[in-house]
A protein has these predicted regions:
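Feature marking well-ordered beta-strand scaffolds used for ligand recognition
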Residues: 1-143
Length: 143
């Protein structure tokens, strides 16, 4: 995690957090990283690339508002293969995950109070799912 100085444009490393288990030996890379709409939690996904040791996960990290450090709270599945991108809905009630290699867009419940990702609300086949853009049909706040 880094602090950004908006006056100078500089980044300063604050903390490095290891998401993978110490004994993990498979191939895995980072996918997406973003904050919850209220800025209380940081979310990060990893991609394991179809290996038996694959590690397609989404991690929830609590942000310390005093110093910007984070602590892993929990991790869970992305409900597909090779997550590329995720987005919260503008109201913060749902989290959408695009899983590229399983060609799916997953919609999950999200509880902003606890930072907990809930049950699957919808699962849609989307060939080459890789990017998500959410447009508010009421004409407000595209994400």
């Amino acid at each position: 995690c880094c602090q950004f100085n908006s006056k100078t444009g500089e980044l300063t490393e604050v903390q490095c957090v290891e998401l993978l288990p110490e004994d993990f030996m498979g191939e895995c890379i980072a996918a997406e990283i973003d904050c919850s709409p209220d800025g209380a939690y940081l979310f990060a996904t990893t991609r394991g690339y179809y290996t038996s040791e694959g590690y397609d996960r989404i991690f929830t990290l609590k942000i310390n508002p005093d110093d910007g450090t984070v602590n892993i709270v929990r991790d869970g599945p992305t409900w597909g293969v090779c997550p590329r991108m995720f987005k919260f809905t503008p109201d913060g009630k749902f989290l959408l995950i695009a899983n590229q290699f399983s060609d799916e867009l997953i919609v999950l419940q999200y509880d902003a109070t606890s930072g907990r990702i809930g049950e699957i609300c919808a699962r849609e086949n989307v060939p080459y799912a890789g990017a998500i853009c959410i447009v508010d049909t009421q004409g407000e706040n595209p994400v």
